[in-house]
Amino acid sequence: MDRILLEILACPICKGKLVYSQDEQELICRFDKLAYPIHDGIPVMLPDSTRPLIER
């Protein structure tokens, strides 16, 4: 994931910062506890495409 792109992108729901998960190929919003998928290097930032994070 391009570092500059990561600095520009924000959670579309809360407008908060996103964290890149290289293992899962997702962008994580820690505030909303949601993960946005990355397909073929393109972040899918649609709220309907998220998956909830499960706390362990």
Swiss-Prot record:
Q: Which Pfam family, any one, appears in the UniProt record?
A: Trm112p
Which SUPFAM superfamilies does the record cross-reference, listed alphabetically?
Answer: Trm112p-like (SSF158997)
Question: Which GO terms of the cellular component aspect does the record hold?
Answer: cytosol
Q: Which InterPro entries match?
A: Trm112-like
* PANTHER family, sorted: PROTEIN PREY, MITOCHONDRIAL, ZGC:162634
UniProt record similarity statement: Belongs to the UPF0434 family.
Q: What is this protein called?
A: UPF0434 protein CBUD_1597.1
Species the sequence originates in: Coxiella burnetii (strain Dugway 5J108-111)
